[in-house]
Structures are given as structure tokens and as C-alpha cells.
Amino acid sequence: MASVFLYHVVGDLTVGKPEMVEFYETETVESAIRAIGESTECGIPVWRKRTTPSLPGFVENSEMRQQRFVGILNSLDIVAFLAKTECLQEEKAMKIPVSEVVSPDNTLLKQVDPGTRLIDALEMMKQGVRRLLVPKSVVWRGMSKRFSILYNGKWLKNSENSSSSSGLSADSTNRPTTSMTSSRDKFCCLSREDVIRFLIGVLGALAPLPLTSISTLGIINQNYNFIEASLPAIEATRRPLCDPSAIAVLEQTENEQQFKIIGEISASKLWKCDYLAAAWALANLYAGQFVMGVEDNMSSRSFSDFLQTSFPGGEQNGTATNAKKFSSRSIGFNPTSPTRLSIGRSMYRGRSAPLTCKTSSSLAAVMAQMLSHRATHVWVTEADSDDVLVGVVGYGEILTAVTKQPSAFVPSNRSYEGFGNENQS
């Protein structure tokens, strides 16, 4: 294991991070859309308001704060919710409180001390934590004397003996392990994207991992969600999503023995789209049509404008067959084969093309792809065949790779057979 994980602490990653402003569950969907556009990982933590009166000198402890955390709301959650028939009214839909949209799961965020070792933080994230809540403006001490801590760019020596020589335990992250003073309720929020960005800066310390292929590392996740291009796009949201929040849109190859990826329905792709237009498309189009048209044809137009110009006489029936922007010809639907989509590769390249890499791609290359595109994942295709999907690599897989012992690597000739979880009802 790289020493960088032992000698760095969570506080090192908070330098320059802004103070977190809580987003409450009573806020509207309209407010959530604005907040998500400025967020990391295409989602925002959602909180309940404090029920305890603000008494003089009262400071909320970590347990109380953890109970107020509801879950993380992302762009795909909002689009899927708005795709419901009763929500396709712009004025009404935008005023709905996010408490009706967010899926409760308060295990996705955890409050930690700035002195928490980076390796302990990575283990938490590997177990499902997506955000770390870190107190700001603290004066702290108490780590084991075996470590000199780099915090806010300065090396600090600990002045007290630790009660345990084994480092931080899982328990110690649930309560303050340091003597500290802090400004009341000032925190910053670290995401997995922040951690990957930090790791990019210390790649040399991780050698030889960064230049090792993802297939050799054995981190290609084959347990992904997918939907066939000829199925209604709304089917992609019928089942609970795993991490990452993404569904691959696939079509069979000519020999019908393999599937190739032509697009995706994901929080990353919907991050800064026109949410109402995307919701209409999700509710009314085939998956293949959706991945080609939602961004290029609709992102710059309002939902009401789309309805007025797409259907003669202001027709707003989502099943109308004479829509202009999403006609069968314009999106590549083959009229001679009503049960199958025939989509040329050139028609879905561009902004709606999925982010892909090869099984032979290095770990460093995949990390760089994710950061440069602000994506939560990269789809993996066969090394010798474009677009034939074998799996996905997300934040969880990368964190597993950088903390894995070299002896745990798998051979690079690993067989990739089978598929992920098909999303159909």
C-alpha cells in the first residue's frame, strides 16, 4: 500500500474547499436543478431542517447532524421523477419539494475529523460512503506519534500520545478523536471526485499502478445496468440503480451474439440538460432515440417551446407520430424493422456519445478521462472491437485498485463473458 495513504489526512484535501451550504428537503425541484448544476458527482446532499431550538451555546453534535441527512439527489433522479405523467406540467413540477424526489439513505454521507487518515477515508468510500463532511477552521491534535501530519500545507508534530498505537479505528471516525475548537457549524463536503483529483496529483507515489491496465487490475465491473435500444427509455428507471447511476443503452451486433453500447442514460449525461425536455423524452421515446436526441436537440430549448414547435397546432400528446425533432427519420429508426433500431455510429457521436475506454487502458488514463469530463464512470469496451461492451469502471473500482495489494491483481487475459443487469420490466 502506498505510504501516501498513511501520511496524508482528510484535512489535506479540504484546502481551498468552500463552506458547505445545506440544501433542505423543503426546497423546490427548481432550486435543486440550479444547485446540481454547481455540484460535484452530479448530485447534492439533502438535509432536514434543525428541530432543536437554537439555544445560546448549543452546538449540534455529529450524531444529530447525521440523523438530519436525508440522502443524495442527482440529475437522473429528477428527470425520472418528472417523467411521470402527473409531473409533465412545467409550473407545477418545478414547485414540488425535493422530499418527494430524493431517495432516503443517510449512509451515503459521514462526518469525519480532519485528522482522519486518508486510507481510512478511502475504506469508508469503498463501503458506500459518497460524501465526507469535514469541520472547517479547526485547531486539532491527537493522532498517533508514529505519524507526522501534513495539514494545510504544514507538517505538524503531535503533542499527545494516542490511546492506541493501531491508528484510527472504524469507531474513531464516528466521534471527534482530536481536541479541537471550531467555528459553529462550518463544514466542507468532500466527494469521491475530490479524492480522485488528489490521487492524480500523487500518481508517482502509486507506481506501478497508474500505468497498469484496468483488466490486469481486475477492476472492470460487469454488474452494470443496461437496456436495449429498441425498448422504451422509461424502462431504464424501473429498477433501483446501483453505483454509478447509469444505464448503458445497447444494441445487438450484426451476428446478434454480442451487444455494443450506443449511449447511456445517466446522471452524468443529464447533469446540465433541460430537465423538463429530457423528462418528456424519457417518457415518450425509445432508449435509442433518447440517447441521440435529448442533448443535441433539446438542451438549448425550453420544454414549452419544444411542445409548441414539435406538434402542429400545439398538440401536446407525447405519443404523436408527427413530431418534427424526434421523427423516425431524424433519429435513425428503421421503418422496415419496427422492433429494432438501426443506428449508424456517426449519428450518435458527439455530446451524447458515451465515454468509453478499452480493457487495455491504463488506470491513469481512465482517471484522467473521468476528471476531464466530470464523469462518474467510464464504459469499458473490448480491446480489439469498438463499442462491444464488457463492463464499467467507476469511483468505487478506482478506489479499490489504488488500495489493493499487488498480489491481488488478476491476469490481463481475464475472460469477460456475460452481461450486467438488464433493465426491463
Curated annotation (Swiss-Prot):
Residues 16-90, 347-409 form the CBS domain. GO terms for cellular component: nucleus; plant-type vacuole; vacuolar membrane. It holds the Pfam family CBS. Gene3D superfamilies: CBS-domain. Residues 159-172 have a biased composition (Low complexity). Its main location: membrane. Residues 159-182 are annotated as: Disordered. It is found in: Vacuole membrane. InterPro entries: AMPK_gamma/SDS23_families, CBS_dom, CBS_dom_sf. It comes from the Eukaryota. Residues 173-182 have a biased composition (Polar residues). It is a multi-pass membrane protein. The keyword NADP does not apply. The chain crosses the membrane at residues 200-220, 275-295. Keywords: CBS domain, Membrane, Repeat, Transmembrane, Transmembrane helix, Vacuole. This is CBS domain-containing protein CBSX6. The gene is CBSX6.
